[in-house]
Regions:
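Conserved N-terminal Rossmann-fold NAD(P)-binding element of oxidoreductases
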Residues: 4-11
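N-terminal Rossmann-fold NAD(P) dinucleotide-binding loop
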Residues: 13-17
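Short beta-strand element of Class I
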Residues: 29-31
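Helix N-cap at the beta1-alpha1 junction of Rossmann-like dinucleotide-binding domains, i.e.
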Residues: 35-39
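Rossmann-fold cofactor-recognition segment
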Residues: 49-64
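Conserved Rossmann-fold cofactor-binding substructure of NAD(P)-dependent oxidoreductases
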Residues: 60-77, 84, 88
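Rossmann-fold NAD(P)-binding glycine/threonine-rich loop
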Residues: 107-153
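Rossmann-like dinucleotide-binding core of oxidoreductases
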Residues: 139-217
């Protein structure tokens, strides 16, 4: 049994929530929270007839730590599942620490303003010197490691599809299916365009940043 607060109700979050509701014996209660509550309500109404999971909804601004704390303290989840934008990772982690709740996300933190002088200095030092060209870096979230350890809490990072599910598939294959593996190629694609003239497999802005950046090997 578990009680999970899901923050986010976009394309990725909707799929993750739908999958959770297929395993009602594990995800017994879900609260879907987003800046736009009507989107949460619509998804809850769509899923409710097909699941035993108890679904509730809430409105929250994930940029506001106090709002997040108020919601977490009111709902009292076992886990906060952050499927909002990566710009909001740190505020949600701060709220989880303040409220004593475990944390999980699907995408590593990056600042919304990549021209911010403080961030640029860290980016130049930690990312560019290491050969990275994408506008993100796990060091911001790794800085929370001791805080979560001291609080007796777990923060599970990067549990999306790639990275995330693909790593689990690779680890399973290496352990159970193959004697040895030399290389693994991972290709991202969509299952159709879903009626959109421009269909990405994640948040369009972030997707364009990623595919236009030189690869790091």
């Amino acid at each position: 049994m578990s009680k999970v607060l899901v923050i986010g109700c976009g394309g990725v979050a909707s799929v993750a929530i739908s999958k959770c509701c297929q395993v009602s014996d594990v995800f017994t209660e879900l609260c879907i929270a987003s800046r736009t509550k009507s989107k949460c309500d619509a998804l809850a109404a769509k899923l409710a007839p097909h699941t035993q999971t108890k679904i509730t909804t809430a409105q929250v601004d994930a940029d506001d730590v106090q709002q997040l704390c108020d919601l977490i303290n009111a709902y009292k989840p076992d886990l906060v599942m952050n499927i909002a934008l990566p710009y909001q990772d740190l505020t949600i982690m701060d709220a989880c620490l303040a409220c004593g709740v475990n944390y999980m996300d699907t995408a590593n933190y990056e600042p919304e303003n990549t021209d911010d002088p403080e961030w640029r200095a860290i980016y130049e030092k930690r990312c560019k010197e290491a050969g990275f060209s994408a506008y993100f870096d796990y060091s911001w979230q790794w800085a929370y490691k001791k805080k979560f350890e001291d609080a007796g809490l777990t923060a599970l990072l990067g549990c999306g599809f790639d990275p995330g599910v693909t790593q689990a598939y690779c680890a399973y294959a290496a352990k159970h299916e193959f004697d040895s593996i030399d290389t693994i190629d991972i290709l991202d694609c969509n299952g159709g365009d879903h009626g959109y003239a421009f269909a990405t497999n994640f948040n369009p802005e972030i997707n364009l940043r990623e595919v236009s950046a030189p690869g790091s090997y």
